[in-house]
């Protein structure tokens, strides 16, 4: 279980789509918004720590949906990488009732991230006729869960057969863990194939690359957020990639949070940025495979940092890359890029893209 402590939430600002600012420039409004977000995160983590203890601070991330309710006493945590759903409560009275409500709401919640505030304890989760987790979870009889009656029966089964407890030194934590189906990742990916194909045709970006980026960034979690306030399936930051894309489309300002939490808008914006990296920022790289490696790395760490691996002069950097084989470019970016995260990112996305190309 990932634990994000308050101090860890105040991260340095980089230059990328999923974690940083693009174009190597900063603006005052963006800095103010980022500082405000850091303050919000620090206060939110402090509130959690007051109830759960220092070692039990768990906050939503790119691949982790975490929602607190009951005045921070109950939380639902979906780990989209591991495929587990953990419902926990520290309620001192009727903990089973608190767990039951949270189990039912989590199983039946919709797929509209803009309607849910993951940074508060407000109970704003609504039951949907088309649950987001439908098909990704089955009950004790092996059936998918769409209706409240089946969710209620499954909750009762879980509380009777899988209820666990532990102490955090302050309170007793009661919990239930649900395993998602083995192919939960594919189930989620399938939801967005139509949107991916539309964006692929619109911007000329390979479907397999879009899917690989989505898997690596969010594990197809539409509720994805990050400590740098990257949002949605492709982890787009409003004031960086979002602003660049809007400018290229003749729009002023930056995309709103609700816009980027909309799956179709997020995929469109993220794909548009991939096209900008490929055609504009890194368009001087001739070999398409070498350019793809550079684009993938730049989506995480910024185009400027990619080129500086080869030369501080951008034109000279492209010229150097054009003298290298794609294999040498890959080797250089995965071993010499200054960011360990970006080095790993290229490996992860490239590996994921190969798997989607085989399908």
UniProtKB/Swiss-Prot annotation:
Protein's membrane topology: Lipid-anchor
Lipidation residue positions, type N-palmitoyl cysteine: 17
Recorded family membership: Belongs to the transglycosylase Slt family.
Domain of life: Bacteria
Keyword entries, A-Z: Cell outer membrane, Cell wall biogenesis/degradation, Lipoprotein, Lyase, Membrane, Palmitate, Signal
E.C. number(s) listed in UniProt: 4.2.2.n1
Catalysed reactions listed for this entry: Exolytic cleavage of the (1->4)-beta-glycosidic linkage between N-acetylmuramic acid (MurNAc) and N-acetylglucosamine (GlcNAc) residues in peptidoglycan, from either the reducing or the non-reducing ends of the peptidoglycan chains, with concomitant formation of a 1,6-anhydrobond in the MurNAc residue
First-listed, main subcellular location of the protein, grouped into a coarse class: membrane
GO terms for MF: hydrolase activity, acting on glycosyl bonds; peptidoglycan lytic transglycosylase activity
Record function comment: Murein-degrading enzyme. May play a role in recycling of muropeptides during cell elongation and/or cell division.
One GO process term, biological-process aspect: cell wall organization
Signal peptide: 1-16
Record lipid sites (S-diacylglycerol cysteine): 17
Cellular compartments annotated: Cell outer membrane
One Gene Ontology term, aspect cellular component: cell outer membrane
Designated name of the protein: Membrane-bound lytic murein transglycosylase C
PROSITE patterns: PROKAR_LIPOPROTEIN, TRANSGLYCOSYLASE
Pfam families to which the protein is assigned, alphabetical: Mltc_N, SLT
